[in-house]
Each structure stands twice: as structure tokens, then as C-alpha cells.
């Protein structure tokens, strides 16, 4: 699979007169370095755990690690490594969804009432950090992504725990579909039978109330659920034919 990637990239480079920059040896070296980085990060405990814990770049669990299992499907990442990813990311599961990472202030409690921009500039980041209420991170739609990833690992490992995880997170994902007369985290109505980007918290008088993000419906979350349901359907058919 990696060799196909290299040959395809070299062909495109040549077509765009960039082939002087690339070579098979160079690309294979870069691919190997990439795999070394992934395995090192996982052995250290997560996404970017090589920093001091007080460093803002330090991070163990990050939902983006699921990319290692799907859709990247990296040929040199074995089942044991994929199991590591699932165990790390599972720590981010909250009552309503999966956090991107701990202390993620984007769409955290009261985000939509604090006149905070979603921009990535330094001032916007600083304002979000100042208004962040601990343990109120947005919980994203990634349950469908996790369910599909767990199903993939179950097929490879045949370990019952991953089959159970795939069913559990599929059900969690389905529970994220909005019902009738729901109010979003910005205080406005949201459509029913729709998938939001995440579930957010509203903090009032010391109490937390969950509500769907006003970013709804989201094609990304719909696509992720579609891929999950297809994976689970295939899994059920495979199990039934045994």
C-alpha cells in the first residue's frame, strides 16, 4: 500500500514537473520516519506526550488518533497499535459524546453566550482560555467514528470487548440525533432528527445543562454515521454467515 502511494505521488510529481524534488528512496525514508513518530507517540502515551505536562502542547488522549485506524488504515500499524489508540481515545468519552481532548475550550460551557469568535488567531484563543470552565469541554459526534474503528479492530483481533465497544458507541451515536422541540446551546431552536457537530454545556447557577451545538446539521457527522452503519451492517452479516 505504501509502495502504491509512492508510485502515485511520483507520477503526479512528474506530471507537474516536480519530480526533481522527489525520489523513491527519499519518500520511503519519510514514510518510515512517519511510522517511527506514530509508534513513539503511542508508546509515550498519546498524541503529543513528549512535552512537559505544564506545556500547552502536552496532550495524551486526542480523538484525532482515530485517524490511525480509519481512514488512514496504515499498512505498518498492527492490531496492537490500533488497540492502543482505542484505549487512549476511550478516556475522552463523556455522557453525550467524545471530547476532542482535555481542556479543549472551543464550544465549552457558555461558549455561544460569551461573544467568542471561532477564529484561530491568538486573541481569540486567549479569550476562550479566560472563559473556560473546567470539565465542560464540548462532546463531539465522534462516537460513530469510534464505533467504526472498534469494529475494524474486532475483525482483526476477534476480541469480544471491541465488538461490545462498537455496539455501545453505535448506540451512543444514534442517541445524538435531536428530538422534537430541542433548544441549542445558543438558546435557539434546532431542527429535529438532525446530527449536531457536538453537544455543549450551559452553565447556570452552578448547574450544567447539555444542549446540541447550533452547528447543525453537519455533513461531517452525517457522513461519519453513514460509514459507521455500513461497517456495522457488514459486521452483522459476517457474524451471521459463520
What are these model-derived regions, one by one?
Residues 131-139, 172-242:
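CBM-like carbohydrate-recognition segments
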Residues 28, 65, 143, 215-218, ...:
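Residue-level detector of extended alpha-helical repeat arrays and alpha-solenoid scaffolds
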Residues 24, 81-82, 159-166, 238:
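Solenoid-repeat scaffolds in large eukaryotic assemblies
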Residues 84-92, 103-108, 161-199:
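Active/binding-pocket-proximal capping segment
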Residues 4, 8-141, 155:
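Extended ligand-binding clefts on enzyme/binding-domain cores
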Residues 126-172:
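Extended, compositionally biased non-globular segments
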Amino acid at each position: 500500500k505504501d509502495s502504491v502511494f509512492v508510485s502515485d505521488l511520483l507520477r503526479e510529481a512528474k506530471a507537474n514537473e516536480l519530480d526533481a524534488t522527489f525520489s523513491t528512496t527519499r519518500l520511503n525514508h519519510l514514510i518510515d520516519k512517519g511510522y517511527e513518530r506514530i509508534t513513539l507517540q503511542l508508546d509515550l502515551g498519546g498524541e503529543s506526550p513528549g512535552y512537559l505536562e505544564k506545556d500547552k502542547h502536552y496532550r495524551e488522549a486526542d480523538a484525532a488518533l482515530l485517524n490511525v485506524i480509519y481512514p488512514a488504515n496504515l499498512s505498518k500499524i498492527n492490531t496492537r497499535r490500533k488497540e492502543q489508540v482505542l484505549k487512549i481515545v476511550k478516556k475522552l468519552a463523556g455522557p453525550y459524546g467524545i471530547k476532542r481532548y482535555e481542556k479543549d475550550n472551543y464550544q465549552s460551557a457558555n461558549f455561544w453566550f460569551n461573544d467568542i469568535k471561532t477564529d484561530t488567531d491568538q486573541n481569540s484563543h486567549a479569550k476562550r482560555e479566560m472563559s473556560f470552565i473546567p470539565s465542560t469541554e464540548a462532546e463531539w459526534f465522534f462516537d460513530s467514528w469510534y464505533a467504526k474503528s472498534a469494529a475494524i479492530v474486532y475483525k482483526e483481533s476477534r476480541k469480544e470487548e471491541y465488538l461490545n465497544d462498537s455496539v455501545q458507541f453505535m448506540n451512543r451515536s444514534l442517541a445524538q440525533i435531536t428530538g422534537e422541540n430541542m433548544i441549542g446551546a445558543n438558546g435557539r431552536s434546532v431542527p429535529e432528527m438532525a446530527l449536531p457537530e457536538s453537544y455543549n454545556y450551559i452553565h447556570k447557577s452552578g448547574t450544567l445543562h447539555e444542549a446540541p451545538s447550533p452547528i447543525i446539521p453537519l455533513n461531517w457527522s452525517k457522513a461519519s454515521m453513514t460509514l459507521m452503519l455500513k461497517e456495522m451492517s457488514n459486521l452483522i452479516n459476517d457474524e451471521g454467515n459463520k
